[in-house]
Amino acid sequence: MDLCNRNDIQALLQRHGFHFSKAMGQNFLIQGWVPRDIAAACGADEHTGVLEIGPGIGPLTRELAQRAGKVVSVELDRRLYPVLEETMADFPNFTLIRGDVMQQELPALVREHLGGLRPILCANLPYNITTPLLTRVVESRCFQSLTVLIQKE
């Protein structure tokens, strides 16, 4: 399944009865080079633990999981949980945290899930939380690098 192919995405979402939510700032990557380039730019390798925020259906998540020692993705939209279970089933180094990243204690999350690895953040950020989230991430001082895609509005 190609998570950047419109037909594959439509079939996947239809199987799970999913419809986009503008209120959640959802936008899914449909050009294959975008998740590949973002994942390459973050410099993840087997010694890296990646925190991803808002994985959506998982195109960036899969690219990260092919490179990193561990990928932890935080997703708020419970409708996407079964979608991610399907798209990430082949990646034992993937963990999904179900909930709101703005309610997470980032240093504790990094210690618990990414301990022993070089912690980085890599994400295609939901536009409705970009500024407050980046503020929290920088203030947490628990990531060695940040690589984010931000929507131009």
Enumerate the language-model features and the residues they cover.
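Catalytic cores of RNA-modifying enzymes
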Residues: 1-153
